[in-house]
Amino acid sequence: MRPTMVAGNWKMNGLSGDAVHLTQAILHAGLEPMRPEVVIFPPFTLLHAVSQEAKSSALRWGGQNLFWEASGAYTGEISGAMLRDMGCRYVLIGHSERRQIFAESDAQIVQKIKAALLSGLIPVVCVGETEAERAQGLTDAVLRRQLEAVLPLLNLEASQPNLIIAYEPVWAIGTGLSASPEQAQAVHVFIRELAAAYSAQLARRLLLLYGGSVKGNNAAALFDQADIDGALVGGASLQAGEFIQICRAAESAGRGG
Ligand SMILES: O=C(CO)COP(=O)(O)O
């Protein structure tokens, strides 16, 4: 399998001018449409600006989070319908920063995934172990717990998976210390095996992104791995040149070059 998605998670960064600049840089980079699919996840406040720039292109965008209720007295929250209204195709759910800083539980993440699916969004569900968990040999156990909540939501009636999984080891996020291609590949194989318990066909087609200090200079080696289908990029997605380099690495991997 070959990388099919490069996604940029801008986190809580950027003002309108930055959104226009970054989006235009990606649009003008001459990337091959959909090889890979390029997706950006700006803050909610920049979704409109991004959608205006990218609406007639192959570039896609999504929200970084959502709340599970459709509407109502939930001050400060954003629903799936609101994201759809901004033209979003995707939504990040369960990012480790949400799990750690905002104490999101596996049960809440399940509610969010259900709400996203009901709204017609494709959830990009983030999983991953902390440094302490890896040191204690708990990586598989943590991923199993996180994914046992998520994988039952796979639509077994469909021919294509209704969600995407991003493996983001917490120790690799924002540290400059990416997982090695072999480490990431081993975990991706494990995740695919867990998914195969629900459906072998969907497991084969499940998009597994790697995230954690992906840069222009390490992306190609990650994409060379058979089960790394793309990347979820944080810091480097805020620098147009770096992000475009990662997209090009995915293009080349897609050509077998
Ligand atoms: O959290 C991430 C993407 O969601 C990864 O962040 P970095 O690429 O900055 O390590």
Swiss-Prot record:
UniProtKB keywords = Cytoplasm, Gluconeogenesis, Glycolysis, Isomerase
Reactions accelerated catalytically? D-glyceraldehyde 3-phosphate = dihydroxyacetone phosphate
What Enzyme Commission number(s) apply to this enzyme? 5.3.1.1
**What PROSITE patterns does this protein's entry cite?**
TIM_1, TIM_2
Task: Spell out the catalytic residues.
Answer: H95, E168
Question: What is the main EC category here?
Answer: isomerase
- Share what the entry says about its subunit structure, partners included: Homodimer.
Q: Which family does it belong to?
A: Belongs to the triosephosphate isomerase family.
NCBIfam families per the UniProt record, alphabetical: tim
Q: What is this protein called?
A: Triosephosphate isomerase
Gene name, Swiss-Prot/TrEMBL: tpiA
